[in-house]
A protein has these predicted regions:
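N-terminal "domain-start" segment that seeds a small globular fold
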Residues: 1-12
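Thiol-based oxidoreductase modules, predominantly thioredoxin-like and allied folds used
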Residues: 4-5, 24, 43, 47-60
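Short active-site neighborhood of thiol/selenol oxidoreductases, capturing the structured segment around
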Residues: 15-27
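Non-catalytic, surface beta->alpha helical segment in thiol-disulfide oxidoreductase systems
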Residues: 77-106
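Short loop/turn elements that flank and shape the SAM/SAH-binding pocket of Class I
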Residues: 12, 58-60, 92
């Protein structure tokens, strides 16, 4: 499942009982576009929720999560950030981190 995160649905998305991968991106960022391909593949899994947030449309959310470079991927479980990756991230690294946060006890 791939969700476009914004200030209106932010709280609802974070309340998921599944692990969450949150990408902060900009539509003009080349590395963001490369990372999104891997995110889309991993979003097909029922084991995780994948959300992306356009920092040009939602700068307050980017600031709230201390995003200073793009793309930034946050791996969240039970509302807590378990991992932060900055820069282009290959789909296999995304999958490994999803597996890692899925193995963390609730």
């Amino acid at each position: 499942m791939l969700i476009e995160l914004n200030s209106a649905n932010h709280s609802e998305v974070l309340e998921t009982d599944k692990p969450l991968v949150l990408e902060f991106y900009s539509p003009t960022c080349v590395h963001c576009k490369k990372t999104e391909a891997g995110l889309a593949e991993n979003a097909e899994s029922d084991d995780v929720v994948v959300a992306k947030c356009d920092i040009t449309a939602e700068p307050a959310l980017a600031e709230q999560y201390d995003v200073t470079a793009l793309p930034t991927l946050l791996f969240i479980k039970n509302g807590e950030i378990k991992e932060r990756l900055v820069g282009f991230t290959h789909k296999l690294i995304i999958a490994e981190n999803i597996k890692k946060i899925n193995s963390i006890a609730p």
